């Protein structure tokens, strides 16, 4: 890409699995940044993360070393977050939220679904808005599922409802929010 002069905006850690689970994450971030400086000096280095490991010191250092941090939080309280996310293992909600509050300049991503689990109900949206206001991200990306999930009881949220959620968040908190569909 560098030899072909293809512009690169951001080199992003993401994929099938959670990148913060890698045992050598901190070293990988520093090596990718070194290579970025050499080949794509104007590109950012970022990560998409479910935030469950952000409390670990090495992970927190790696995340702070990045220019862009996309961190997920799909619920305004622990019960809804667990219902939507279905995390593996024992993830401590309060620890995860504290870590999100301590990370600088994050972009929060929140997925909304309807069906047996529905995090678009007015009461839950108010809880979520309060939480996002406490976390104080740079911005929020609101989205829904884009293909049929393994659990057929989850359904996508209409675009108009996502736009209402994003607008309400911005109006109440002043935090920019945009809908990805």
What are these regions (language model features)?
Residues 1-10, 24-27:
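Conserved alpha-helical substructure of the radical SAM core
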């Amino acid at each position: 890409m560098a030899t072909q002069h293809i512009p690169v905006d951001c080199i992003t850690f993401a994929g099938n699995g959670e990148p913060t689970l890698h045992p050598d994450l901190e070293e990988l971030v520093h090596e990718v940044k070194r290579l970025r400086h050499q080949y794509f000096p104007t590109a950012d280095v970022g990560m998409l993360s479910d935030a469950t490991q952000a409390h670990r010191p090495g992970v927190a250092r790696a995340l702070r070393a990045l220019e862009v941090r996309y961190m997920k939080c799909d619920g305004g309280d622990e019960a809804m977050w667990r219902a939507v996310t279905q995390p593996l293992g024992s993830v401590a909600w309060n620890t995860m939220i504290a870590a999100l509050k301590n990370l600088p300049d994050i972009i929060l991503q929140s997925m909304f679904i309807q069906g047996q689990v529905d995090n678009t109900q007015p009461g839950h949206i108010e809880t979520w808005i309060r939480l996002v206001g406490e976390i104080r991200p740079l911005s929020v990306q609101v989205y829904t599922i884009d293909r049929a999930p393994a659990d057929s009881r989850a359904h996508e949220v209409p675009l108009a409802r996502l736009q209402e959620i994003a607008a309400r968040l911005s109006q109440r908190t002043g935090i920019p929010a945009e809908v990805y569909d």
